[in-house]
């Protein structure tokens, strides 16, 4: 493996960043960092509780601080939260020091995965057309990642292999 860069997984909530990240880190022998799980551990609260008690701004500020801190390290697989890559500072740090992969799914697949999930504070009270709009808006930013992986017709293991092959060739 030539690269010492991090692998950073970006994409919508429900895209599989955490599950793909865990599999990928085992496959290539790098540490795995799930930013949302790390935030929950530090705060001793779920993401939903943080949003409810402290608000989205507090969460986003904390997410930026923790994400940028982790992105400065090397040789990790990092799963960013669904909204983290929208933050210009996180995106800039990611693109400067990491190889980023957008786990892209069709809106219909993502909607099926997230619409009834109580752990997703941003979509808890949204209608399907509002979720679709959120997906479309975020896609305009996710596209700036280094690589786009179209996941709909791939198994988790095929996604992992694709990322591994690209990373090892970079």
Positions of predicted regions on the chain:
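NTP-dependent small-molecule kinase module
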Residues: 1-4, 23, 27, 73, ...
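Hydrophobic anchor at the beta1->P-loop junction of P-loop NTPases
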Residues: 9
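P-loop (Walker A) phosphate-binding loop of NTP-binding proteins
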Residues: 12
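Walker A/P-loop
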Residues: 18
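Short amphipathic alpha-helical segments
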Residues: 22, 89-92, 112-116, 161-162
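ATP-dependent small-molecule kinase phosphotransfer cores
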Residues: 31, 35-95, 120, 128, ...
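Short glycine-rich anion-binding loops that position phosphate/pyrophosphate groups of nucleotides
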Residues: 82-85, 106-108, 154
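A glycine- and Lys/Arg-enriched "phosphate-lid" helix/loop adjacent to the NTP-binding pocket
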Residues: 97-140
């Amino acid at each position: 493996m030539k690269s010492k860069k991090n692998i950073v997984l970006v994409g919508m909530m429900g895209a599989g960043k955490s599950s793909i990240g865990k599999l990928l880190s085992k496959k290539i022998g790098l540490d795995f960092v799930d930013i949302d799980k790390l935030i929950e551990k530090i705060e001793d609260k779920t993401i939903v509780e943080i949003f409810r008690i402290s608000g989205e701004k507090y969460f986003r500020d904390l997410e930026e601080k923790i994400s940028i801190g982790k992105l400065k390290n090397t040789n990790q697989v990092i799963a960013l939260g669904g909204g983290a890559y929208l933050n210009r500072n996180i995106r800039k740090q990611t693109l400067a020091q990491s190889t980023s992969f957008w786990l892209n799914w069709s809106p219909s697949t993502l909607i099926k995965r997230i619409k009834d999930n109580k752990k997703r504070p941003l979509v808890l009270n949204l209608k399907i057309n509002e979720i679709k709009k959120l997906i479309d808006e975020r896609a305009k930013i996710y596209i700036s990642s280094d690589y786009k992986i179209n996941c709909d017709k791939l198994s988790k293991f095929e996604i992992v292999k694709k990322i591994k092959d690209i990373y090892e060739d970079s």
